[in-house]
Amino acid sequence: MKQEFHEYRTSNAMDWDTMLSLVRKLYRDGDYRMSLLIGCGCFFGLRISDILTLTWSMILDGDKFTIYEKKTGKRRVVKVNKGFQKHVKACYDALKITNEDEKCFLSRKKMVYSTQRINILFKEIKTKYNLKIDHFSTHTMRKTFGRKVFESAGTDAPLALMRLQTLFNHASPTITKKYLGITDSELESSYDLLDF
């Protein structure tokens, strides 16, 4: 009997502009839930298990919402970006939602998507939109969020790494650095941003 070995592949972060373009293309093509899902994942930095618990009332109107993370049980307050909230409203209207307490990510059968199903859909999206990313999965969204926060920090990159460690509930900045694929040279380049 032939034994199969499954290689574990870690997902990659997506370039921020590529992500925004993908979210807009999915919306344009009528794939409102996937557009919203990828947007929520990249703007909120949540694990997929927490994204799938979101209801429309949580993300539609308020400037923040509170969840208890499934994996850790910890309370987390998530701020909703004003620009992204307009996209949430557009998806809500396009889907003709009538119940704000409905989960955001329901299939046609009115069941919440499974992580496995989303990963299958992501493979299809990667092919259809010719995404230049090695491993596109549900982890990609969280890593994209982390990478954007880190890269936007400039000279405060080490501080951003510590903040991300807290947001991601990692035991140390080293774990966060490895999770996001941040190299020592990227951290050291923070010092090159300073002028004298």
Regions found by a protein language model. Give the residues of each.
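Conserved tyrosine-mediated DNA breakage-rejoining catalytic core shared by Y-recombinases
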Residues: T18, T53-Q85
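Short basic/aromatic active-site micro-motif
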Residues: K132-S152
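C-terminal catalytic core of Y-nucleophile DNA break-rejoin enzymes
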Residues: Y8, K70-K89, D101-K123
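Alpha-helix N-cap/helix-start motif at helix boundaries, enriched for small hydrophobics
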Residues: L37, G45, S49-L54, L164
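C-terminal secondary-structure termini that scaffold catalytic or DNA-interacting sites
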Residues: M1-M14, D195-F196
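Basic, Lys/Arg- and aromatic-enriched nucleic-acid-binding interface segment
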Residues: K2, M14-F44, T155-D156, A160
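Catalytic-site neighborhood detector that most strongly recognizes the C-terminal catalytic loop/helix
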Residues: E69-G73, F168-L193
